[in-house]
């Protein structure tokens, strides 16, 4: 695990975007695992800037998003499909057929989850996975005490997660209580992983994930076992970290 501590959010975003650009330049048909939320928005803006400077070509890239709220249609501004189109996909030359995001309105969730795993396998697995980390240590929507053997599945969202995500909605009551998420096993099979965190609110989770014991109660702690993880965090998120 390589840990990069930066001064601020902008620097974190630029470093992450540069790593994604390098991946796509070296392997134009890369399979990218993408995340949503506040943390990667700056990274996506930087990627768009790199693309506009003609240094990046998405025409052969395939993407798989980590998760989607259950019960939100894709036209809903709070859906992660809407988020990805607005923050990245509408601004680059990606083939829309190569975009994969769980369908939160699927009639049969079990079939949807198995099909998502099949698509990842058919694509050859994920070359580079972007992750954020929740205040409770979750990655994707894999909440504390999730099985490390989990694949794409329907999740009951933790109260902390609902509380944290309520800032995106008019009220806490509007936040969906379930989501479809790639599982820990799905994530850990990625060839390379970049974990992003910014701000003091994430410092506990970052410390426990990196310095603590590998424990299902802190889902991100499983990343200690992965052979190629880069952690990019600002000074506030790193404030409780014991660096060797």
Swiss-Prot record:
What CDD domains does this protein's entry cite? GlcN6P_deaminase (cd01399)
Q: Which GO terms describe its cellular component?
A: cytoplasm
Which residues does UniProt mark as catalytic? 67, 136, 138, 143
Q: In which pathway does it act?
A: Amino-sugar metabolism; N-acetylneuraminate degradation; D-fructose 6-phosphate from N-acetylneuraminate: step 5/5
| Biological process terms in GO annotation | carbohydrate metabolic process; glucosamine catabolic process; N-acetylglucosamine catabolic process; N-acetylneuraminate catabolic process
Annotated InterPro entries: Glc/Gal-6P_isomerase, Glucosamine6P_isomerase, Glucosamine6P_isomerase_CS, NagB/RpiA_transferase-like
Alphabetically ordered keywords of this record:
Carbohydrate metabolism, Hydrolase
- MF terms per GO, please? glucosamine-6-phosphate deaminase activity; identical protein binding
**Gene3D superfamilies on file:** 3.40.50.1360
Q: Which reaction does it catalyse?
A: alpha-D-glucosamine 6-phosphate + H2O = beta-D-fructose 6-phosphate + NH4(+)
Under Enzyme Commission nomenclature, its number is: 3.5.99.6
Protein name per Swiss-Prot or TrEMBL: Glucosamine-6-phosphate deaminase
């Amino acid at each position: 695990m390589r840990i990069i501590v930066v001064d601020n959010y902008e620097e974190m975003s630029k470093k992450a975007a540069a790593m994604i650009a390098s991946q796509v330049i070296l392997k134009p048909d890369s399979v990218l695992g993408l995340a949503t939320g506040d943390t990667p928005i700056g990274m996506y803006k930087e990627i768009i800037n790199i693309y506009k400077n003609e240094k990046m070509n998405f025409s052969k890239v395939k993407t798989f998003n980590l998760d989607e709220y259950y019960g939100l249609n894709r036209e809903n501004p709070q859906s992660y499909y809407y988020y990805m189109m607005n923050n990245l996909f509408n601004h680059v030359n990606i083939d829309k057929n190569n975009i994969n995001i769980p369908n939160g309105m699927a009639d049969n969730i079990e079939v949807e989850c198995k099909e998502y795993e099949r698509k990842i396998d058919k694509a050859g697995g994920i070359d580079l996975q972007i992750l954020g980390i929740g205040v409770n240590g979750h990655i994707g929507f894999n909440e504390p005490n999730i099985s490390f053997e989990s694949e794409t599945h329907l999740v009951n969202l933790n109260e902390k997660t609902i509380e944290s995500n309520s800032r995106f909605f008019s009220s806490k009551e509007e936040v969906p209580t379930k989501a479809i998420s790639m599982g820990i096993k799905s994530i850990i099979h990625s060839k390379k992983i970049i974990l992003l965190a910014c701000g003091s609110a994430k410092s506990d989770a970052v410390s426990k994930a990196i310095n603590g014991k590998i424990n299902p109660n802190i889902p991100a702690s499983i990343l200690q076992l992965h052979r190629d993880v880069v952690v990019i965090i600002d000074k506030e998120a790193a404030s409780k970290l014991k660096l060797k």
